[in-house]
């Protein structure tokens, strides 16, 4: 799905915060380890406020996509990589994103989650 590739490209180019705020639906949800669900664009913006994301990069590669027969919902899953610039620490894992077509025809995610600890080489 082009939206997911564009999402990752924006994260790499302009930072994770900008990418997530650009691609989350207004009522989208993010599930992360050891955290309550982040519900909606406004809550995500409040979490990101005053927290720079220039110290690390997050990118991902979708390996599968499916759009439902109605053309308004779809999902992607794949592998992600993170890199902490100061320490050189890397991470990788898997993710799934559920997408909804918006009234303007664009795709925004309504649910995003991932798990860590899976080396990219074990695809």
Language-model-detected regions and their locations in the chain:
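Residue-level hotspots at or immediately adjacent to binding/recognition sites across diverse folds
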Residues: 52, 82, 96, 120
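A short, structured loop/turn motif at beta-sheet edges
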Residues: 65-72, 85-88, 100-106
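Short beta-strand edge/turn micro-motifs at domain boundaries
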Residues: 92-118
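A solvent-exposed, acidic/Ser-Thr-rich amphipathic alpha-helical stretch
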Residues: 15-68, 77, 87
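Short, structured motif recognition centered on aromatic/hydrophobic residues
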Residues: 7, 73-77, 96-99, 107
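A short acidic/glycine-rich loop-to-helix N-cap element
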Residues: 86-90, 119-123
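Short, low-complexity N-terminal intrinsically disordered segments enriched in polar/charged residues
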Residues: 1-22, 121-123
